[in-house]
């Protein structure tokens, strides 16, 4: 490491400390981003990966999907472990046995064709109603696989992707995505690095950047109603002109609402 370098922002490809011995021993201040180096005491700024995947899985499960397939990277890392825990935590919330969790590893190092083949096999084996992707490239390969298989999204399979790629809102349909706050992560990492350069230690304690669930058009709700009726988006439910006339200017009680509910239900079922 060049001693003239004031500081380094480092994105580790591994979380094993022995892979970075020279960097650690150099004395040059550095901060890790996205992944930490285990057992080293090195400062890092990471995304809330467990919380992120929980959000995605929770959204699908709350929409009535019980057969949710989770694709994750096959690498042995804390990031993969945290995302897996988030998925399992969501299943537990809905009283789904985690032993029955549909989790498939995708080995990105094998290349696009092999990854898409693995995804295709998993889709045919598990026949999910919804899929959650655990990484940027997995999301891309998943969408390509669905296209090649002629699977309608979200008609046949709902999809929640992962990442910050601009193409996610340009796909058809626009992709519901777990969007990482990359700018927030970068700002925190730079701030922490300057603290270390100026004082020798990192003063900041907020070492995480958020991940937001951005809901678009690649997911749909399944049957959730009390009578086995289909769930519907609010903007697809409306009263007829006759019903509007009947209810105009009236304070409705429960006995008035129930017939209206059944009428509307019959139109969207």
Walk through the language-model features, giving the residues of each:
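Hydrophobic alpha-helical segments within soluble ligand-binding/sensing domains
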Residues: 41-70, 85, 89, 111-120, ...
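An alpha-beta-alpha
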Residues: 54-94, 201, 205-220
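Flexible loop/turn connectors
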Residues: 116-227
